[in-house]
Amino acid sequence: IELVLIGVLARGHILLEGLPGLGKTELVKGLSRALDITARRVQFTPDLLPGDITGTPVLQERDGTKNFIFQEGPVFANIMLADEINRASPKTQSALLEAMQERRVTVMGETHALPSPFFVLATQNPIELEGTFPLPEAQLDRFLFKINVNRTPADVLTRIVLNREMGVEPEISPVLNAQELLELMQMARNVAIPEVVADYIGRLVNATHPGESEASGGVKYGASPRAALGLAAAAKARALRHGRAFCSFEDVQAVIHPVLEHRILLNHTARLDGQTPAAVINRLVREIPAQNKPLPDSLAAAKIH
């Protein structure tokens, strides 16, 4: 839950992966109620069309004149819940690309701005399940976080059984509204990032590429500059979450896995050997020193941005 909150404060899109029934959809629905913002849910299926997400022009007659009127799709909400996103075809998945990056959609040459704040919270099943389509790399890169949802421990299951009833929605009272959420997002953007921390982020992301570190020996493609920006934004949001006005090496290390795991593509040999992006990142954190230069002895020397 903390990672989801950090992702929202960082204005990022979040992908939740796990087996059916683990509460991924409930988490997203509960978040929308707690933040008191609009949410629209789309169940992704193989026959879903791009227009079912972005909206379509509808021919209407008014005063004897026929005109196309744009009918907004479910993407026009503060939160769009893309449920089981990898069950739709790649063409339909790609309909979200412009919305996720530019926070707008273009239909028949006309551009329509999306509400603010806007972010996509998507759920997907592991690709080993039948009827799933891997997300395109370009779309994966637009998700700030990919969070693996694991099975629920026995003690948590006990509390669920005692406090929940199947088919009954839990009562969740709003704790924020849209304007207050926007103000918190701006506060996260204003969190300072010292130059030594920015340097650490740059060296970490660069080290994900083949030939740049020992840890990246089995990597085919490393993380993009967008990943570096996302890592900085997530570190800032975590610092705000913990009541600090500047981010630290610890913040970077706390969010590096959900930011980078889905952006590292291993080569065929590494996959056959059982390597995982998570293992590569663990090795990177051990291999790349946090401090590449002496720590500053004053605030002015820290070059805080």
Features from the language model and the residues they span:
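Conserved alpha-helical scaffold flanking the Walker A/P-loop in AAA+ ATPase domains
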Residues: 3-6, 60-81
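Walker A/P-loop
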Residues: 5-46
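Conserved beta-strand position immediately N-terminal to the Walker
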Residues: 14, 80, 118
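Walker B catalytic acidic pair
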Residues: 18, 83-84, 95
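P-loop (Walker A) phosphate-binding loop of NTP-binding proteins
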Residues: 19, 53, 123
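Canonical AAA+ ATPase core
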Residues: 60-65, 88-92, 100-191, 236-241
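AAA+ P-loop NTPase domains with strong preference for DNA replication initiators
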Residues: 155, 162-247, 272
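C-terminal engagement/docking regions of AAA+ P-loop ATPases
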Residues: 210-305
